Amino acid sequence: MASIVQPSPTFPALNLRRSSLIRPPSSVRFPLKCNAADPYKFDGGNSAGFHLLTGDTVPASFSRTRLEDSIYQNTTRLRIFSGTANPILAQEISCYLGLDLGKIKIKRFADGEIYVQLQESVRGCDVFLVQPTCPPANENLMELLVMIDACRRASAKTITAVIPYFGYARADRKTQGRESIAAKLVANLITQSGADRVLACDLHSGQSMGYFDIPVDHVYGQPVILDYLASKAISSEDLVVVSPDVGGVARARAFAKKLSDAPLAIVDKRRHGHNVAEVMNLIGDVKGKVAIMVDDMIDTAGTISKGAALLHQEGAREVYACTTHAVFSPPAISRLSSGLFQEVIITNTIPLSEKNYFPQLTVLSVANLLGETIWRVHDDCSGAIEPFSTLGID
């Protein structure tokens, strides 16, 4: 699906010292990718994505740095390491910062145990470990814990767990008796393993930040998606933002406010079991409108697809789905590509296999948002300046 993206007034260009990065062609095509020169601006057409970038495969153009005053690899105390969960995103972050990814050896023994060895010194360094705990969640979580432990034993000054997608985030409270609160347990594990800070993107609920006994920087992917939607030049009179459930109303309301204070509609549903949802009613008017459905994640797509079907029944002209985290558990792909949606807009917090691409899918990159946040944390700068104040960084 081709998209022509024009500059948008929604988020003005950041007045930061950056130079652009040029992405060369690749066999994997993303309908849209973030322009590394500006976290809020995009390149139209088919910008390239990369399956895996290593020291031997990184294009020469990626050697350009984020800053006019280059970060010198041999003198900086900033180190970025990637786990095996999302090396593409980690490479994009390091390219934005003008750094090479740290050298690390990660392997599985025959019995499935995880082995991690840092292959360069991190003594006295600010270390950032990029590892979403996406499926397989248990494997990726354990790998992150072992990476943190390795950095602590190697005398790193500070260790920040960069978790673009925080697994177990939905288990943040008891819904029935004698249940665990797994989100709190995972927070304890990360803290006790030796992390000094967590950088997470679009947590399922705000209270999850309180589960940690260490600082948490909460980065929102919302500005990236908003800027892309603003570039589509849809009349504000035709827009309506839809929350797929009552729990997402606050998120959808904030989203609508940024889109020219668009009206809000709510899909009222009742869940009869895990990953099973039933649409009950629509609160609001969508007749003849372009409906923008907003959620923090899409798992099996049951909630959002049934909501989209209801919106069409109620007379919506077009339906867009917007989410930060594309978990895409079966049968999500078949539901999302069934024709209910004009476009499905996601970010790259979770790696997406090539077989899961479909024509309506658009992928945006959050690498620059995470890279800028990492730099500000390392440089002891506040993120609470416009437009970074929209990211919720303190």
UniProtKB/Swiss-Prot annotation:
PANTHER family: RIBOSE-PHOSPHATE DIPHOSPHOKINASE FAMILY MEMBER, RIBOSE-PHOSPHATE PYROPHOSPHOKINASE 5, CHLOROPLASTIC
Catalytic activity: D-ribose 5-phosphate + ATP = 5-phospho-alpha-D-ribose 1-diphosphate + AMP + H(+)
Taxonomy of the source species: Eukaryota, Viridiplantae, Streptophyta, Embryophyta, Tracheophyta
Gene3D superfamilies hit by this protein: 3.40.50.2020
The EC number(s) this enzyme carries: 2.7.6.1
Top EC class for this record: transferase
Protein name: Ribose-phosphate pyrophosphokinase 5, chloroplastic
Pfam families linked: Pribosyl_synth, Pribosyltran_N
Keyword tags: ATP-binding, Chloroplast, Kinase, Magnesium, Metal-binding, Nucleotide biosynthesis, Nucleotide-binding, Plastid, Transferase, Transit peptide
NADP as UniProt keyword: no
Transit peptide, start-end: 1-33
